Amino acid sequence: MDTDANIGSGTVCGWSATGNTTFSQRNITVGVMKIQEALCPRSLEQYWMQSQLTAGSQYDGVPFEQAFSEQKALRIAEALETAIWQGNSYFSGVNQLLNAASGSTVLANASSTTWNPVSASVGITTSNVISIFDKVYNDIPQAILTKTDLVIFCGWNNFRTLIGALKSQTGVMYNQVDLQGLADGDIIYPGTNVRIVAVPGLTSTNRIVATYLGNLFYGTDLLSDEENFELWYSKDNDEVRFQAAFKAGVQFAYPDLMVDFRLA
């Protein structure tokens, strides 16, 4: 939804509509996914985990349930994080959606009178990373500059390169950048109102994406679905079974309010 605020004269009586509201729609393609795994407790007899197995040769429990569940939840979260940005077989990620919307998205690495595109052969380095982030920031549409949830997303590799450049080329690093934010991968870009957030899903892609959080949408059934799973011993099959089922998809509302940097 978008609406304007055209101010009209209030000196006369009567009704004279000056406002206009428009509605549009973008669809979220939600992928229906599941993860299933079968484990044989007998295979643990050759490892230290045998000490956690039930005495004897008949196993009817899940001795490693907590450790396995914690590790599996971590791996599911990592896989979903990558899918949100890069997509998978079941839904398109942000990068793929940006590729499809290139005609209306602000392309930060496009050639202009003031910018020479950075090629893949050159890459993002300590020599050019500050100018790249400056370009992304300067390309953010004026319509959203005053929003309090502006974010520039990048991969951890580019975040590390940026921090290295700030340390070596300017003294601003120690004066304006929050040290805890460095550890968390979440800082305010010096001299701006924009956060820079490092996300694993963009690591090694050399894509940098800027918009406001209210422009990004994550579609699912239940937010906790990927954390709710079953782990049980199947006596019929003489094995431990794991299953997780969830739905997920992403979309953005206004492509023209997205800044997309990709190497030329």
Report the location of each language-model feature:
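Intrinsically disordered, low-complexity linker/loop segments enriched in Gly/Pro
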Residues: 38-48, 52-85
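Phosphate-interacting basic helix/loop segments used at nucleotide- and nucleic-acid interfaces
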Residues: 129-142
